[in-house]
């Protein structure tokens, strides 16, 4: 487990914790080999490149958690993994904002694909819900409807939405790490799963 040591008060039992930071403080990763790396915190291509360049010869399989926000157009149902991706007007931008998030993640994916050619898995989850979701974007709506009265909601009643329970994503990621699932995969509920 590689992190800055700031967000988890107690160490995870049985798991070695390596302290560092993606922005150049990677010394604790040097001189070690791994079967699989699961990268769930890559938001800026430069940071991902620092990691992949260091680990390229020391890791057999690099698994990168991306997002469906990389797609240029999500207005139609059935977006497949080969759909066009977002392109940033300025690919050197490093500020993660609503308008740069998807494009930055697409650039991060490109770094992983280049440095781990044939040895990578990119998982593109949709909206994640479940334990640990502090956004309240999923639980708010049933709660609000239970309050009764008029309410303003985005979209139209027939707009589809696809979400994914974080526990299902975790199972898929672990299965992908344990078996030779290579390539790019969307991770979401079935297209008719929620309306």
Briefly describe each language-model feature range:
Residues 1-39, 60, 108:
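N-terminal Rossmann/SDR dinucleotide-binding element
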Residues 32-92, 107-111:
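NAD(P)-cofactor binding segment of oxidoreductase domains
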Residues 66, 108-131:
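Conserved beta-loop-beta element that borders a ligand/cofactor-binding pocket
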Residues 93, 144-164, 186:
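A conserved pocket-lining segment of Rossmann-fold NAD(P)-dependent short-chain dehydrogenase/reductase
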Residues 101-105:
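Active-site YXXXK catalytic motif of short-chain dehydrogenase/reductase
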Residues 121-142, 159:
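Flexible, glycine-rich beta-alpha linker
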Residues 162-169, 179:
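A conserved structural motif in NAD(P)-dependent oxidoreductases
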Residues 172-195:
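Mid/C-terminal beta-alpha module of Rossmann-like enzyme folds, strongest
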